[in-house]
Amino acid sequence: MKEVFIVATARTPIGSFNGALAGVPATQLGATVIKAALERAGIAATEVNEVYMGNVLSANLGQAPANQASLAAGVPNSVPCTTVNKVCASGMKAIMLGAQSIMLGDNDVVVAGGMENMSAAPYYLDKARTGYKLGHGNITDGIIRDGLWDPYKDYHMGNAAELCAAEYHITREDQDAYAIESYKRAAAAWEKGYFKEEVVPVQVPGKQMVTVAEDEDYKKVIFEKVPTLKPSFQKDGTITAANASNINDGAAAVVLVSGEKLKALGLKPLAKIISFADASQAPEWFTTTPVKAINNALTKAGMKISDMDYAEVNEAFSCVPIANAKDLGLPLDKVNVWGGAVAMGHPIGCSGARIVVTLNSILHQQNARYGVAGICNGGGGASAIIIEKV
């Protein structure tokens, strides 16, 4: 099979819920990173063979969101586009599908990533077509219904995360401490300019054009309040608004090329994709499925977890990286070293791609070689990918 290389990455800043990016459609956020990634790669849009973009909350976004983003980025309308919905793993699965298409010889240049504007997700009027007739009616929150709700147990993903915390004896104090460290790592990474090369500023139109160039959420934490917050999902729970990820807006993308195209165009690679894998188990245990996906990817690569210099394990909840690191035998000082979704935010269709983008940056700026990224998704699934800095 053909080798696959990452030749460029880009991500938007991550906007707060109803924050600076709330008025920018997910498709426009996607277009921003597609265009930026191609420009950074030095590849003409006419060279692109296919586009894959993850997106979860597609209601009211219009037909074929990936196609909208691709066309808005200047990619020709002759290029096929596919929107991927694997809940929180959508952006990573898009990269995996793009890589597979190159490995199999179907494509030579693919743009892949994810995009989400959770702030813009609509409410649903469930009985609007048939009529409410008489009496009170309900509206359904599209964010919760299609993004954050387990339809099997009929509860919030946070309730499932409480199972993980209990099973692994992860206390409220453990999770709060992890969350505070995530915020501190994100702040330090921004202060040191670590994200500068991956982030592309977003122009937000209005009475005056506003440029958004930095993640919003990590600056809003008040550390003294973290231990005082009430549990979010059950009265005796340990998960709070501070030690869980937030609701956010953002996009991320990578440009993938075959080894042959790399040479033909004289491109400089950033990383090589070594392997990738999915895994699944009972829906309520999605929190620990990254362990299985990462181990599957390691097995395919003929590698061990000790070969990984750094890891990105998406922080859907603080208990997720804590539990997964424990099962994998990963020291936490190798995991999410620039902070994670708890501090930076979790635009669900984007995050799988975002952690790949950040992992690549970490490998380059920390002079490391191998990294693995893993992300859980609703329904009991997870995806993982191993990359090597080139």
What is each stretch, according to the model?
Residues 160-162, 195-198, 274-343:
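Active-site pocket-lining segment
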Residues 1-61, 65-73, 77-80, 160-172, ...:
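Conserved active-site "lid/cap" helical segment
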Residues 11-12, 23-31, 40, 174-264, ...:
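N-terminal extracellular/periplasmic Venus flytrap/periplasmic-binding protein-like
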Residues 55-109, 152-156, 223-246, 327-354, ...:
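Conserved catalytic cysteine-centered active-site region
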Residues 84-116, 165-194, 253-260, 325, ...:
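Active-site-proximal alpha-helical scaffold in enzymes
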